[in-house]
Amino acid sequence: MASQEFEVEAIVDKRQDKNGNTQYLVRWKGYDKQDDTWEPEQHLMNCEKCVHDFNRRQTEKQKKLTWTTTSRIFSNNARRRTSRSTKANYSKNSPKTPVTDKHHRSKNRKLFAASKNVRRKAASILSDTKNMEIINSTIETLAPDSPFDHKTVSGFQKLEKLDPIAADQQDTVVFKVTEGKLLRDPLSRPGAEQTGIQNKTQIHPLMSQMSGSVTASMATGSATRKGIVVLIDPLAANGTTDMHTSVPRVKGGQRNITDDSRDQPFIKKMHFTIRLTESASTYRDIVVKKEDGFTQIVLSTRSTEKNALNTEVIKEIVNALNSAAADDSKLVLFSAAGSVFCCGLDFGYFVKHLRNNRNTASLEMVDTIKNFVNTFIQFKKPIVVSVNGPAIGLGASILPLCDLVWANEKAWFQTPYTTFGQSPDGCSSITFPKMMGKASANEMLIAGRKLTAREACAKGLVSQVFLTGTFTQEVMIQIKELASYNPIVLEECKALVRCNIKLELEQANERECEVLRKIWSSAQGIESMLKYVENKIDEF
């Protein structure tokens, strides 16, 4: 599968919202400044290293400011000492006995003028930046020199033996390079990912079999010299190896990072959340992470609020599922960012498009939803859903089409279709009665009853309920255990469970979508949805 990777380039800023919760301004690599987003701290649980580095850099800025103030004080004191020493020299050279003749007075004036010139020269020396660096070196130990030698071999700088003391004081990055692989410099500009191989450099054969360790400062310093590439695993650089940032470690090919960094520009590139794209197209409303043995699809919509579904979001999810079906992933983890899992269809979006041309727009939207539901029905690999918050409408009705549903204890589930002014979708007209009985299904589909996570688990809509504080950790532990199983066994188990109801689900999806098309193509149906959009109350 041809793919590119886009990651968090840096955490730019930090703030507190009106509720006192911490938020970080995240800059995505490959995106412009205007695409920066404020993310709550809980969204960055897989990027704790990145958050830690940002906080540490803020602390070091404060220390640097204090050091600059100290240097200025030292500079002023040095000027005073120089002035005093000049005056002392002048007093020694001046006559000690009073003279009254003009000859001696002219000599005194010359000496005084000379002393003024000395003071001016001393002040100019102290004000010069290069000279001040020499002076400041007496009060603070200089950083060790770069371990790179300036000699080159065929356009590449060679590595000299490292100072063992300097090496112990710096972070170690383990690398392994394979001959003939193209590497991408992670310190290149944000848009470099989308420009093909313009910023990739061919590894010289003399360096092809090198394996060992280099310091982070070496990799950082190499970015400023021509003909130098950062030595990382070529498979990881080309996007063909699994990479993730699960807490508490960072994993990426052959790279291993020890946590005592003082080389922020290099380290911040090593802690990231991956955005995976196929055929050089970027997902806008979801984040796809290629993990070890499974693919995680995170619903994180930008075009809608509260992870609502419109045609663009639905198409991105379908594309991500089709890609996961074709790659070597054993299963799929479907989750969401924020406090809401999914609030169903974005009816404001649907009303806006249905107003222009009801017949054509309703047919296109129904086909999109039909394809979306059929993708879940026909997906051969197991789908695990991590429900972190409220699941409403289509966000709840697709859950029975998945294989395992793990819910946060604060999550709740509701399908108030009559309130929406539409009919059931997502095969809920058949899955809900089979799962929880007709009475409970009618309570949800017609009366719009809300189920807590515990109630949903008791009725079979949810597999397990986890505590809020350990929800993410529990999900990752269990999903990694599932990913360690034989993929053939996983697929065959799902096939045996679904074989008797697959055709029935497809027929139910066809019926539901036909009813939706009739409602959306009618004036009464649009009016009902518009009334809901105008009168809906924010429950979150």
From Swiss-Prot:
Q: According to the UniProt entry, which residue ranges have a biased composition of type Polar residues?
A: 87-97
Principal location class:
nucleus
Q: Write down the chemical reaction(s) this protein catalyses.
A: L-lysyl-[protein] + acetyl-CoA = N(6)-acetyl-L-lysyl-[protein] + CoA + H(+)
Q: State the UniProt keywords alphabetically.
A: Acyltransferase, Nucleus, Transferase
Annotated region Disordered: the residues are 76-106
InterPro entries, per database record: Chromo-like_dom_sf, Chromo/chromo_shadow_dom, Chromo_dom_subgr, Chromo_domain, Chromodomain_CS, ClpP/crotonase-like_dom_sf, ECH/Chromodomain_protein, Enoyl-CoA_hydra/iso
Chromo domain mapped to chain residues: 6-66
**Gene Ontology CC annotation, any one:** nucleus
| Record-linked Gene3D superfamilies | 2-enoyl-CoA Hydratase, Chain A, domain 1, 2.40.50.40, Lyase 2-enoyl-coa Hydratase, Chain A, domain 2
EC no.?
A: 2.3.1.48
> Which molecular function GO terms apply here?
histone acetyltransferase activity; histone H3K27me3 reader activity; histone H3K9me2/3 reader activity; transcription corepressor activity
- Quaternary data: Interacts (via chromo domain) with histone H3K9me3.
Q: What does this protein do?
A: Has histone acetyltransferase activity, with a preference for histone H4.
Protein name, as recorded: Testis-specific chromodomain protein Y 1
Q: Which organism is it from?
A: Homo sapiens
